[in-house]
C-alpha cells in the first residue's frame, strides 16, 4: 500500500519559532494580556534614555512619595518628620500635660513613640502642647539671604544642601542598641536623652562631599536637638552652615526648604532629602533618597558619591535632575 504524506493546508499558519514564542510571552507579560492561540507580536517601543544614572530610582521614589504628603501641625516636634507619609514624633509626648514625668509614663509613651516613628501610627489621644516661638532667622546682605557670602575656600563650588533626620541619621527617644552617640536636650526644664544612629557610609560621604561642595545642613528639626547632633556627626568639619526649622517656609502645613532664599545660584544648588514635600518649590534641583531607620546594609549614600562627583562638574544641575514624568 502506497504511503501518502499529508500536505499542510495553505491556510494554516507557520508554527512560530522558539524566539518568536519567547518574544510574544514577554510582550504579553508587559502588556498584561493573555496569549491567544494565534499570538500577535508587537514590536518594542523605543525607550527614552534617562538623563542620569539614578533617574529610574528617582522616578519611582517620587511617584511613591507623591501618594501622600505629610503635614506638620499639632504639638511641638523636635525631630523632623521621618518620612513623607508619616507624622514626626514629639519628645514632649513623653511629658504629662502638667509638666511632670514618671518612669511608667515615659515607658508607655516610649513604646508608642517607637511604633509611631517606624510605622507611622498616630497616637490615639495626642497630648496638646503649644509650639514654642521660633527664634528670628538671621539674614545676610541686601537680599536678606539665609546664608552669608560664600567663603573664599568654597569659591567655585556648588552648594550641596543635606537633610538630617532619616537622610544622614536616625534619632529615637526610645532606647536603641547600639546607638552611635547620645545627645541630651532640655524640654520644659527636664533633660531627655536622644539616641542617634548614623546611616551607613555617612562619614565617608561627608568627607568626600566636603572636598567638592559647599555643604549646608538644612533641617526642619529644632536647633536644640539638631545642633548637638551635628556637633557629634561632623568629625571632618565640612559642614559650613546649619539651617533649622525657623528657616523653613510653612506652605500648606509643610515645612518647605526654599532654595531661592539661600543666596546661592540655583543652577549650582542641589538638595538631598528623604521628604519630597521639603523641596516642592525646586524639584528639579533635588536628589531623592529613601528614609533610613535601621538597615545597616543600606549603601545609598555611598552609591550617590560617583553621581554627585559628576554633578559637581555640570554647568546647571537642573538639566540633569529635571524629571520628565
Swiss-Prot record:
GO terms for molecular function: phosphoprotein phosphatase activity; RNA polymerase II CTD heptapeptide repeat S5 phosphatase activity. Residues 153-311 form the FCP1 homology domain. PROSITE patterns: FCP1. InterPro entries: Dullard_phosphatase, FCP1_dom, HAD-like_sf, HAD_sf, TIM50. Residues 62-71 have a biased composition (Polar residues). Transmembrane segments: none annotated. The modification Phosphoserine is found at residue 52. Signal peptide: none annotated. This is Uncharacterized protein C2F7.02c. It comes from Schizosaccharomyces pombe (strain 972 / ATCC 24843) (Fission yeast).
